[in-house]
Amino acid sequence: FLDKNPDGGVIFFESESAITKEIIEDRDIDSSRMVVMPVTTVQEFRHQAITVLDKYIEQKKSERKPILLILDSLGMLSTTKEMEDTQAGKETRDMTRAQIVKAAFRVLTLKLGKAKVPLVITNHTYDVIGSMFPQKEMGGGSGLKYAASSIVYLSRKKEKDGTEIIGNIIHCKNYKSRLTKENKVVDVRLTYDKGLDRYYGLLDLALKYC
């Protein structure tokens, strides 16, 4: 995104306390074009994201610079009620979280579309119990599933050079898409020393179709 938009920027909503300026710069990303905003609850993320979008929409279209919003991750976000219950020593589960997530994305989807700003979200998955064939499902209820234009499920296997583990092969299944064919699987390679290999698999395609 930053390569294709030299005047653009990224706002990174971070709930896992895992991103630092050093990590960003070690991956050859210009940290001056990336703002990291810590969030702890769904409500806090919703408020901050809406504030960013409202200020962006207030600008004249000719003055708007491209921005990308990222949330990592939805699965780690608590709720205000859960935080209050934990502080009070209660062990009750917050049964309203799915409704809060759904309400948040009802509002955000409209504002993102109006502003023409993309939002990328990472989330946790779990195995659905009780079906004959185990299936993966996203956490947080159905709100994000209905709001998203594309959903990609990721799984991985170790990539080895002899006996040494050098990275991972990541299986990317296009679970939902309004833009392309669904249920297609693409493998990408992520090595520890070089990062994402953008050319992985192209040779196999050339040999298959040429």
PLM feature spans:
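A conserved segment at the C-terminal end of the G1
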Residues: 1-3
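Phosphate-binding/switch region of NTP-binding enzymes
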Residues: 94-209
